[in-house]
Amino acid sequence: LCDADYSQIELRVLASMANDKTMIDAFNSGDDIHTITAAQVFGLPVDMVTPVLRSRAKAVNFGIVYGIGAFSLSKDIGVSRAEADKYIKGYLATYTGVADYMEKVISKAKADGYVTTLFGRRRYLPELSSSNGMLRAFGERVARNAPIQGTAADIIKIAMVKVFERLKKELPDAKLILQVHDELLVECPERDAEKA
């Protein structure tokens, strides 16, 4: 079995969709995005970021993509709600493009009734006009998340088609057998492992 995966695809999609220069620079530097985020959010030099702080920054990075709030983040990483709120605010102050994107995507979703991926797929959001506040809040989380997750899914699907076609031409004994999140698994003879 051979595998290939996209490194932090959803965060990269977020950086692109939000056109967040700080996040794009962090990815382009080749450094670990979670360590960079921890350093920026907690105001530390990169070499002083501990594994615990990196783990908290990772939870914030991915939590933002999923529309996490302070209550859920506090439970996920074992800190007070006030501390979790401080982390989220620090993150959004660091990645101002992400903060702007989050506001704009919700406003647009409320006006249009849907959000789209970069490839044009729509996710309709009737929850945004609900009289139930919890449903509206859910709709806002989905409005922030669906374009990012959906675009990442679109990219993976396109990659699957391209890998399938290329394997068919170049390595007929190799088979694309599984997709797991941002990873593709190929079964092939050992002699073809490097090419696959």
Region locations from a protein language model:
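Conserved catalytic core of nucleotide polymerization and phosphodiester-bond processing enzymes
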Residues: 1-196
